[in-house]
């Protein structure tokens, strides 16, 4: 399961890349989404690689992301009471584990498909270079967890 974070804004962006970012629900800087690892999504990531960063999210980081930044329609926080009433799970943590293991989805559980994060503490490395070159863009594998923790 990939976590994707939008790093760069919308000024000067080509229309096909903007459309791809819209399909990924990444409309603003510091928004994050979680998607399964499928060939169609990998193609979308390659197309938008100059505006986003992504990597494999760990289960612990995903649980923290859902409990701290997960929202319901109306910008309400996700609570254990809501999860007990509206899903088959007992707590937010159990729901996060089920979503991580692809037993259910964010949409099926009633959560919004994106997470609005803060800019990272100590800032981005460089928003115009790839992660390999010492920047913030592109694929970063397990390092995405450190960035997410700085942004939650």
Swiss-Prot record:
**Which superkingdom?**
Archaea
What does UniProt give as GO cellular component? cytosolic large ribosomal subunit
An annotated Gene Ontology molecular function? RNA binding
Q: Check the record and name the InterPro entries matching this protein.
A: Ribo_uL30_ferredoxin-like_sf, Ribosomal_uL30, Ribosomal_uL30_arc, Ribosomal_uL30_CS, Ribosomal_uL30_euk_arc, Ribosomal_uL30_ferredoxin-like
> What CDD domains does this protein's entry cite?
Ribosomal_L7_archeal_euk
Q: Which UniProt keywords apply?
A: Ribonucleoprotein, Ribosomal protein
Q: Per its UniProt record, what SUPFAM superfamilies does this chain match?
A: Ribosomal protein L30p/L7e
Which GO BP annotation is one of this protein's? translation
Q: How does it assemble?
A: Part of the 50S ribosomal subunit.
Family to which the UniProt record says this protein belongs: Belongs to the universal ribosomal protein uL30 family.
NCBIfam families attached to this UniProt entry: PRK06049.1, uL30_arch
Name used for this protein in its record: Large ribosomal subunit protein uL30
Organism expressing this protein natively: Methanosphaera stadtmanae (strain ATCC 43021 / DSM 3091 / JCM 11832 / MCB-3)
